[in-house]
Amino acid sequence: MQHQVLGLGIAGLAAARLLRAQGYEVLVWDEQDSPLLRQRQAELNQEGIPVRLGQPFQLAEGVKQVVVSPGIAWDHPLLQAVRQQGIPVVGEAELAWIYLDHLPWVGITGTNGKSTTTALVAEMFKAAGLQGIPCGNIGLPLSQVALATLQGKLKPDWIVAELSSYQLEASSRLMSSTPGGPPRIGVWTTFTPDHLERHGTLERYASFKARLLDRAQWRVLNGEDPYLCRRRQDWEKTYWISLAAPQLCCDQDPTATLDLRENRLYIQGEMVAELEDFAERCPGQHNLQNLLLAAAAARLAGLPNVAIQKAIRSFAGMPHRLERVAQIQVGATPIRFVNDSKATNYEAGWVALNALSPPIILIAGGRAKQGDPGAWLRLIRAKVARVLLMGESAPVLAEALQGIHYTDVELVPTLDVAVERAFAAACSLSRQAQRLGKPAQPITVLLSPACASFDQYSSFEHRGNHFRACCQALQGSLEC
């Protein structure tokens, strides 16, 4: 047995197939067991790859290298024992790098905003007539892209990789000066506390994110992020974006500018795009930050302004990120249902509320993460008409809201009930405004949990899809 892959998620599945296609013997091992994993087990067995499920990880006999899926903790006891035996341990992203290091990469990381930024960069490459494959923590697993490239099924010009802290933690060689060079462009969107249950400390979490920037040839950073600004002297060849300042400048080239004025994007003085439609599809200041980060990366990659313009016009936004999934007209009042299930921490929850105008009915809760909810709670008090809380964190969050004298709170058992109760609350607000003679204005029912999904769902996508289905079913029932 030459290679052992730990974890049978989509990344582990792709890694196993990549290794097998290169002629290696492969064993896949996952401690979990489920119908989905058994389906994948059957597929791999047919491809000559044995799979063990539902057993604690063990090192198989004769293994020369262990490949780790992003969901497996890098300090897992088995991995510590493997390293002590001198057996190499690599992450799935690093494995893919071995086969993709001949291509230029844009690597994008950050606590929030990285998926939208990655998708925007990929859209800009597409608009330029180039294949910039969005992959990694978004889209295709990196190993799947590597295999498809080796087989000639994909012919990427660039790799546009969203890289999570889990992937960067397990990618020391990817982030080092190996033959083929480091990622060409590194982008860091934001930094706030997250995943501390995995990484232990904020400093350790930051160190994994910083790996990408330390090794990139060019860097694009959010100049409005307090943590990143404190590290301004750490990196050369860096572009800093800002909505507050009139321009983006490169430390080495002050003439390279990118700025927003009067809802227009300018690059080196040329008006590239009107942003009113983009702001409607992708609301919030954070999405303008994402746009600036993507445009800066695109310019560093040599893309023309016309490609950036075309991508801005065509970009439809991302599922589960302030995604409008339904609208119900109640008299003169439109009630909009917005899916922000990707908001899995307090900072993301704050960003969503900050992007929308009141009145807002908020659905929140799930499995709480470490972090300070203070700013999020204060914005709820300022902008939210009613809060519906679900999941493990509901009692704790309700108590926290009571602590700041916010009392329009209801605990609900499921998302189905939350949608029904939120719609009832929105209708009540509409009737109240009508009685008071106030002009009709849109009411937003917002799912922005500010918590992880794993208490009730398999992923934030699962939770967001359920919300979308509930809202569209409600809309359909009222249209009949």
From Swiss-Prot:
It comes from the Bacteria. Pfam families: Mur_ligase_M, MurD-like_N, NAD_binding_8. The keyword Nucleotide-binding applies. It catalyses: UDP-N-acetyl-alpha-D-muramoyl-L-alanine + D-glutamate + ATP = UDP-N-acetyl-alpha-D-muramoyl-L-alanyl-D-glutamate + ADP + phosphate + H(+). GO terms for biological process: cell division; cell wall organization; peptidoglycan biosynthetic process; regulation of cell shape. SUPFAM superfamilies: MurCD N-terminal domain, MurD-like peptide ligases, catalytic domain, MurD-like peptide ligases, peptide-binding domain. GO terms for cellular component: cytoplasm. ATP binds at G110, T111, N112, G113, K114, S115, T116. Coiled coil: none annotated. GO terms for molecular function: ATP binding; UDP-N-acetylmuramoylalanine-D-glutamate ligase activity. It is an enzyme of class 6 (ligase). Its EC number is 6.3.2.9. InterPro entries: Mur-like_cat_sf, Mur_ligase_C_dom_sf, Mur_ligase_cen, MurD. Its main location: cytoplasm. Cell wall formation. Catalyzes the addition of glutamate to the nucleotide precursor UDP-N-acetylmuramoyl-L-alanine (UMA). Belongs to the MurCDEF family. This is UDP-N-acetylmuramoylalanine--D-glutamate ligase. The lineage of its organism: Bacteria, Bacillati, Cyanobacteriota, Cyanophyceae, Synechococcales. The gene is murD.
